[in-house]
Regions:
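Generic detector of low-complexity/intrinsically disordered segments
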Residues: 10-11, 61, 88
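Conserved short "hinge" loops at termini or chain/domain junctions
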Residues: 1-56, 92-106
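Mid-chain, well-packed structural core segment of small domains
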Residues: 49-53, 59-72
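Protruding loop/beta-arch "assembly-hinge" segments enriched in small, turn-prone residues
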Residues: 70-106
């Protein structure tokens, strides 16, 4: 992910109760969102669609809140169960895809 779209930015702003428009704050928030997306993608080994309401988006929202509070060191520790769950789900999906490919199933 290279750029935050307006929908995702709006969703995150709504979730963190930032209802006002401020270009400088939006730019900073967009950077935090991008870093969060990249970190979650790296941890799980795949790219998620953060516009969908899913566990990855929940983790992203929590990442943003922790980043804004200056507490990113605590984020991975406090959300380790959710992160591990998301990793396992992705590993199971990847395994199923590999097995389906071996059997010629699409």
């Amino acid at each position: 992910m290279n750029e935050v779209n307006e929908k995702l930015l709006g969703d995150i702003k709504n979730n963190i109760d930032r209802t006002w428009n401020d270009d400088a704050a939006d730019k900073k928030l967009s950077g935090i969102i991008l870093r969060g997306c990249n970190r979650i993608n790296d941890i799980c080994g795949c790219e998620f669609d953060y516009e969908q309401e899913n566990t990855a988006k929940e983790l992203l929202i929590s990442y943003v809140m922790y980043a804004l509070a200056g507490a990113l060191d605590d984020w991975q520790k406090n959300y380790s169960q959710d992160i591990n769950r998301l990793q396992l789900i992705q590993e199971v999906k990847a395994y199923a895809d590999r097995e389906a490919g071996k059997q010629g199933i699409v």
